[in-house]
């Protein structure tokens, strides 16, 4: 039955599985690093902004502008533009390793801004109360900002993770491997539409799973 519906896919099962694993590798490495960096920069943005608990206009201005600039660069351009960084840090500019750096650079600015918005939702009264009790900025960050923003951070993480799935597919267009590379190499270049449709279906399943997990985590 499947041999008739998706004949080109059935003869490429090992390559499809390899592509899925490569996608998971890219998402795992870049997602983990982007989460840590994005959370850090998001916190820096919220505490150094005007009337923040550690207000510092120069720091906020520089970081805000860098994030805006990086977010404005299309990912398909960002990949070749960061090729020298991939070679310097990862030792290669192709394959899964070569995609990690551009994926991080493409994800961190977006996630940082999402974290800033999530932390901005915290009730100012709670922050003032913590300051009145003598809490240090670090204590306020962990006990108030992060603790009170867990549902919002979960939503931001879900949105970013879904965006990252799309970026990994796009990275495949420039030879990074994964599902995007599988769809382009076999589906598009060899005119095998069933390969493209199966790839789309797998990506939709990944997005659905990520959204379902995110919805559960974001429930207060």
Each model region followed by its residue ranges:
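Transmembrane alpha-helices
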Residues: 137-168
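Glycine-rich helix-loop "coupling/hinge" segments at transmembrane-helix boundaries
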Residues: 167-197, 201-202
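Periplasmic/extracellular loop-to-transmembrane helix junction in inner-membrane transport proteins
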Residues: 1-31, 56-61
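Loop-to-helix entry region at the N-terminal start of transmembrane alpha-helices
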Residues: 18, 22-26, 71, 75-110, ...
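Short helix-to-coil transition segments within interhelical loops
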Residues: 119-149, 189
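Cytoplasmic-entry segments and transmembrane alpha-helices of multi-pass inner-membrane transporters
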Residues: 44-82, 103, 108, 114-117
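C-terminal transmembrane helix and the adjacent membrane-cytosol boundary/short C-terminal tail
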Residues: 44-50, 132, 196-220
């Amino acid at each position: 039955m499947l041999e008739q519906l998706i004949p080109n896919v059935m003869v490429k099962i090992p390559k499809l599985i390899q592509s899925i694993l490569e996608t998971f590798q890219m998402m795992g490495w870049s997602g983990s690093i982007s989460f840590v960096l994005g959370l850090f920069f998001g916190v820096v943005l919220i505490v150094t902004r005007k009337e923040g608990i550690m207000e510092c206009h120069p720091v906020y201005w520089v970081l805000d502008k860098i994030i805006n600039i990086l977010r404005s660069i299309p990912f398909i351009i960002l990949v070749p533009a960061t090729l020298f960084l991939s070679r310097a840090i990862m030792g290669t500019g192709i394959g899964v390793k070569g995609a990690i750096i551009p994926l991080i650079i493409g994800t961190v600015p977006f996630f940082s801004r999402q974290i800033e918005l999530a932390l901005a939702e915290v009730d100012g009264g709670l922050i003032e109360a913590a300051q009145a009790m003598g809490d240090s900025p670090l204590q306020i960050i962990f006990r108030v900002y992060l603790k009170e923003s867990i549902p919002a951070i979960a939503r931001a993480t879900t949105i970013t993770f879904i965006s990252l799935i799309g970026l990994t597919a796009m990275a495949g267009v420039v030879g990074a491997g994964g599902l995007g590379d599988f769809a382009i190499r076999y589906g598009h270049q060899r005119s095998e539409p069933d390969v493209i449709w199966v790839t789309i279906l797998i990506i939709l399943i990944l997005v659905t799973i990520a959204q379902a997990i995110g919805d559960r985590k974001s429930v207060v």
